[in-house]
Amino acid sequence: MDYDFKVKLTGERERVEDLFEYEGCKVGRGTYGHVYKAKRKDGRDDRDYALKQIEGTGISMSACREIALLRELKHPNVISLQKVFLSHADRKVWLLFDFAEHDLWHIIKFHRASKANKKPVQLPRGMVKSLLYQILDGIHYLHANWVLHRDLKPANILVMGEGPERGRVKIADMGFARLFNSPLKPLADLDPVVVTFWYRAPELLLGARHYTKAIDIWAIGCIFAELLTSEPIFHCRQEDIKTSNPYHHDQLDRIFNVMGFPADKDWEDIKKMPEHSTLIKDFRRNTYTNCSLIKYMEKHKVKPDSKTFHLLQKLLTMDPIKRISSEQAMQDPYFLEDPLPTSDVFAGCQIPYPKREFLTEEEPDDKGDKKNQQQQQGNNHTNGTGHPGNQDNSHAQGPPLKKVRVVPPTTTSGGLIMTSDYQRSNPHAAYQNPGPSTSQPQSSMGYSSTSQQPPQYSHQTHRY
């Protein structure tokens, strides 16, 4: 390259430090890099942005793949990549996203902490419905464009804070996302282990090579159950995850303890699964005779004859062929009964969810010492950046206390957003203008994101 042209190009290249103010505003840290809350220096707008600095120098093929996908995907419920900055001097890569003040992991953690403090604040049913509908809408868009997310979990479901998009869900962390219309190799050959254990579909645990978009639907079912109960439905202790073998005895045992062992008539192709022989050797059907999703959800006061349970059952169908699709789920009767889903998931909600906290340079992210924690995700996890994931998934200890930024309680009122193409086919299920508040009153406990909770659930991290 001509030297003078190279010098000119370097001078014209936009530098992230010239455009954005972000010093002292770190909100996330991991082996994938650092995430900062940022604002424009020129005051062109007053929006908050998320700046992710990818760890290391240069850019990997996996990160290139994620960036290429995000540049093409445009949907209200999928995180928007605004810009990519490449620093020529130090070869650092910065990604600019919309900033989301909340995510489902912290929202669920808030409610779980309230239960632990003996003053439970239930997640409003209307909010659960709105969250689920928007997640399905975003995933339907991805699936319609031949994209599998493959790592859906509460930490990857962001929710926008105050602003024009308040209360809107944003599906984030596309580091594991893949096109599935015509892969050159079976997806299982490219990535033998995908999806965080607790949200991993049974066909993945049994070694399915040609898995489908049904794996995302199972994960959504797990998230739905967690929203209803404030507890991970298939929580289990973690083992060594460095192996590329997808088979996981304890995770299957947990699924069977909730769902029961699948009957041959309910999942005819289970005998074709690569790990079926191991399954038969390790498990006995009669061990789980008294286990069922009905019994599990009844303990959490979800009635088996309710539309809520019927949809959950369709999402958590063991046979991937029989599992409901995202489009079918959006048309389910559950979304046609009051309260109807809204564009602002916080509509009518008076619960003071805490904002994201700023981290100091010496302060770890809220998962504690990684060396003392069990690892939950495969060592191929990229955290959406193409670099090894933050293996900070604690099962043995809870998050350490951090410096808390005190935030005042907020009340919410939502507005109508434009209906997506997929909603137009089912106008009755489209977002509704929220009416007066019917949700639970604001808690006086003043919970923050450092509230104590059962440590076995402290396994997530901030994602973009």
Swiss-Prot record:
ATP binds at V27, G28, R29, G30, T31, Y32, G33, H34, V35, K52. Residues 409-426, 434-446 have a biased composition (Polar residues). The active site is at D151. Its EC number is 2.7.11.22, 2.7.11.23. InterPro entries: CDK, Kinase-like_dom_sf, Prot_kinase_dom, Protein_kinase_ATP_BS, Ser/Thr_kinase_AS. Pfam families: Pkinase. Its cofactor is Mg(2+). One of its GO terms (molecular function) is protein serine kinase activity. Keywords: Activator, ATP-binding, Kinase, Nucleotide-binding, Nucleus, Repressor, Serine/threonine-protein kinase, Transcription, Transcription regulation, Transferase. One of its GO terms (cellular component) is nucleus. It is an enzyme of class 2 (transferase). The keyword Flavoprotein does not apply. Residues 21-335 form the Protein kinase domain. It is found in: Nucleus. Residues 373-391, 447-464 have a biased composition (Low complexity). It catalyses: L-seryl-[protein] + ATP = O-phospho-L-seryl-[protein] + ADP + H(+); L-threonyl-[protein] + ATP = O-phospho-L-threonyl-[protein] + ADP + H(+); [DNA-directed RNA polymerase] + ATP = phospho-[DNA-directed RNA polymerase] + ADP + H(+). Component of the Mediator complex. Interacts with ccnc. This is Cyclin-dependent kinase 8.
